[in-house]
């Protein structure tokens, strides 16, 4: 029994380490609400070049984010999406909402580089999106629900 248990411990430690690293990468800055962090990462009413837009986001985490989507509409329009009927999110929670129709967005995918010299390939789309929404926290705009996570591009 002991050799088998000793053999699985390093694997468990590796998995725990990878999970902690993933949580730290996704963690929002301490001085922002989840909705403020969503806005920083995803709301970009006027399209910008991915490399420069991503450099702002990457400064918060001090790493190159692998993939990011920018919604080219004001925060108020994304917040209105939170008023559409609830649907299931990818994680099975029921706090997701789909945009009314196709929206202009840009997806940026990391192609090369190490922080702070991250390089991205951008792809422009016109497609619906799904966001997770929660009640606002102190410091958030006064909508009944605010977007906190971009769950999926449809």
Curated annotation (Swiss-Prot):
Active-site residue list: 42 (proton acceptor), 149 (proton donor)
Top-level taxon of the source organism: Eukaryota
Stretch forming the signal peptide: 1-27
InterPro entries hit by this protein: RNaseA, RNaseA-like_dom_sf, RNaseA_AS, RNaseA_domain
GO molecular function: nucleic acid binding; ribonuclease A activity; RNA nuclease activity
Pfam family, one: RnaseA
One biological process term in Gene Ontology: defense response to Gram-negative bacterium
Signal is among the record's keywords: yes
Gene Ontology CC: one annotated term: extracellular space
Cystines in this chain: 50-93, 64-118, 82-133, 89-96
Tissue expression from the record: Expressed prominently in the placenta and is not detected in any other tissues examined.
Assigned keywords, A-Z: Disulfide bond, Endonuclease, Hydrolase, Nuclease, Secreted, Signal
Record's keyword annotation contains Acetylation: no
Record's subcellular location: Secreted
UniProt-listed Enzyme Commission number(s): 3.1.27.-
Entry's family note: Belongs to the pancreatic ribonuclease family.
Function, as annotated: Has a low ribonuclease activity.
Name of protein: Ribonuclease 8
Species, as recorded: Homo sapiens
